């Protein structure tokens, strides 16, 4: 009974951060609205400067819960530049917590307020946050044939003309990779095979349009492209089968003990501009991600096997110690009979 209560209480750990984050959102948006109204008679770049500062303060509070409160260990591979840069951030997508990983990296460059997102169009109806993300410089896009290239170019061009600092986060897969949604994975792999591209197993085939438009439109404004690969530990069975990545509540409950972030900085001048070559380039980056995730699975399995082996050795050692103590307390004649029978 007591154990069940403890387990249930622990599973509700996310209620505190959820209550704080949602509870403070109206006050944050109210203060932002007042500033937005006041800034209509001020230069546009001044609005973005103050907005970035206010957004950074709010996101720092959010990040505290995800990075400190949870106790999840963050392992970063690669060297993050110390100075702020204007970048496009490209990452694999498998969890509703993926956006917080961008915050974890941005804050290490003191660029948390500059984080903006390319989001699927349906998220603009998200209560409280949906409209604000657009005002903060984010871009809502529709998929495939409904993608509005002109609208995205116009939005990004207006930002760059003002000299707005840019940390634009894009998830090129367009939707989250979930090993339980086999139809989505099969369709993605079939499309890659049809286009003559390598078939990927642990990520989805990336869609190129939003990434290409962003890099092409802001090429003179950008310093680099950040190529990010995220792997959540603790989502493999002993047989090596992959479970879905943790949701935000699961992440806050530390159901993921460790998150691995592979950081790779790419010179924007080395990225091809022509759509055909850009598609190949982007797919090659996701091939590398696919291989990293395979290697990560192998390492996790080896770690799991090592832990099981250590437990087995420990249990065997305990058994032998018990046997020795038992033998020491046994009469000599009885011990000799046991050994002869053995």
Tell what function each PLM region has.
Residues 1-88, 93, 100-101:
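Membrane-anchoring hydrophobic helices of lipid-metabolizing enzymes
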Residues 1-32, 303-333, 342:
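Alpha-helical bilayer-embedded segments of polytopic membrane proteins, i.e.
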Residues 6, 49, 53, 146, ...:
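Charge-dense, low-complexity intrinsically disordered segments
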Residues 16-23, 27-38, 53-57, 68, ...:
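Alpha-helical membrane-targeting segments
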Residues 40, 44, 331-342:
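Interhelical loop segments of eukaryotic multi-pass membrane proteins
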Residues 65-246:
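Soluble catalytic domains of membrane acyltransferases
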Residues 164, 185-315, 319-322, 326-327, ...:
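Catalytic lobes of large eukaryotic enzymes
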């Amino acid at each position: 009974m007591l154990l069940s209560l403890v387990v249930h209480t622990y599973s509700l750990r996310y209620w505190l951060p959820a209550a704080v984050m949602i509870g403070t959102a109206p006050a944050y948006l109210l203060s932002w609205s007042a500033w937005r109204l006041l800034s209509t008679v001020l230069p546009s770049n001044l609005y973005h400067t103050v907005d970035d500062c206010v957004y950074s303060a709010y996101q720092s509070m959010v990040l505290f819960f995800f990075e400190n409160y949870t106790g999840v260990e963050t392992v970063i591979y690669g060297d993050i530049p110390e100075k702020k840069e204007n970048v496009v951030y490209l990452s694999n997508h498998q969890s509703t917590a993926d956006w917080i990983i961008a915050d974890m990296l941005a804050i290490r460059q003191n660029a948390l307020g500059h984080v903006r997102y390319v989001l699927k169009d349906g998220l603009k109806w998200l209560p409280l946050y949906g409209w604000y993300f657009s005002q903060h410089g984010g871009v809502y896009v529709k998929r495939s044939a409904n993608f509005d290239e002109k609208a995205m170019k116009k939005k990004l061009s207006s930002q760059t003309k003002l000299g707005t600092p840019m940390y634009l986060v894009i998830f090129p897969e367009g939707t989250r990779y979930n090993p339980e949604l086999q139809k989505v994975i099969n369709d993605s792999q079939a499309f890659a095979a049809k286009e003559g591209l390598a078939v990927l197993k642990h990520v989805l085939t990336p869609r190129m349009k939003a990434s290409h438009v962003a890099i092409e439109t802001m090429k003179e404004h950008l310093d680099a492209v950040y190529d990010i690969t995220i792997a959540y530990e603790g989502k493999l069975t002993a047989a090596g089968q992959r479970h879905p990545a943790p949701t935000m509540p699961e992440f806050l409950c530390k159901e993921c003990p460790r998150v691995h972030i592979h950081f790779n900085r790419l010179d924007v001048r080395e990225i091809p501009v022509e759509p055909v070559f850009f598609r190949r380039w982007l797919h090659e980056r996701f091939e590398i991600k696919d291989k990293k995730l395979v290697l990560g699975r192998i390492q996790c399995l080896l770690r799991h096997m090592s832990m099981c082996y250590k437990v087995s050795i420990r249990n065997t050692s305990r058994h032998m110690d018990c046997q020795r103590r038992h033998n020491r307390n046994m009469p000599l004649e009885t011990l000799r009979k046991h050994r002869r029978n053995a």
